[in-house]
Regions:
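Amide-donor transfer/coupling interface in amidating biosynthetic enzymes
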Residues: 13, 58-198
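Cysteine-nucleophile active-site neighborhood
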Residues: 1-80, 85-88
Length: 198
């Protein structure tokens, strides 16, 4: 509803029609479709809201929120002509919708683990011209090789050379947590803390 009130829906559709890349994650993924149905009025008092119509699916909001840490594989992500394949990719889901195709589209990811339980769930789709895709998986850009592949595909469109992975997100995150722990240990009376805990 916010997109429509602000007129952003027309802007996004106009840019997509010009071939500008569009990526939707979670709620953005749902909005790329034809319609978002909300029979339980989870998100609003509307029974349904028209989507952007950029992807061939309909989402129905459910009463229960899905929250999972996920591991997924990607057999092929042809976004902007790239040829990315990857396994053991990480992310997370936090959504209340179920998305169903209205006609065929290429699936992107195969979720193989949800909160440490083995599953086989298809997630995400890409359009026929390979410049629009969406997924329920948050954190896809935390996967270094996938992020670099997408950045390089965008660089190629601008006539720039491709670059290797230059930043390792998970290593950085771990080192920052270690640094935080060191700071806490240095400036906090841990012995007293454990005494209080009993």
């Amino acid at each position: 509803l916010y997109l429509k009130r602000q007129g952003y829906d027309h802007d996004i559709k106009a840019l997509a029609a010009k071939g500008i890349p569009v990526v939707g994650i979670c709620g953005g993924y749902q909005m790329l479709g034809e319609k978002v149905c909300d029979p339980l009025h989870v998100e609003s008092s509307n029974d349904a809201v028209e989507g952007l119509g950029l992807m061939p699916y309909v989402t129905t909001m459910q009463g229960e929120k899905n929250t999972y840490q996920v591991e997924f594989n990607c057999e092929a992500l042809p976004f902007l002509g790239m040829d990315f394949k990857g396994s053991h990719l990480k992310g997370y889901e936090i959504h209340m919708g179920e998305t169903v195709l209205t006609h065929s589209a290429q699936s992107l990811f195969n979720i193989v683990r949800r909160s440490n339980q083995p599953v086989q769930v298809q997630d995400g789709y890409i359009n026929e011209t390979h410049h629009i895709f969406g997924t329920y998986c948050h954190g896809i850009f935390d996967n270094d090789d996938l992020r670099r592949a997408i950045i390089n595909a965008l660089r190629k469109r601008k006539g720039l050379e491709t670059l290797p992975v230059q930043f390792r997100y998970r290593q950085y995150k771990e080192s920052e947590f270690d640094r935080l722990a060191d700071t806490v240990r240095k400036h906090f009376d841990m012995k007293k803390f454990y005494e209080v805990l009993g």
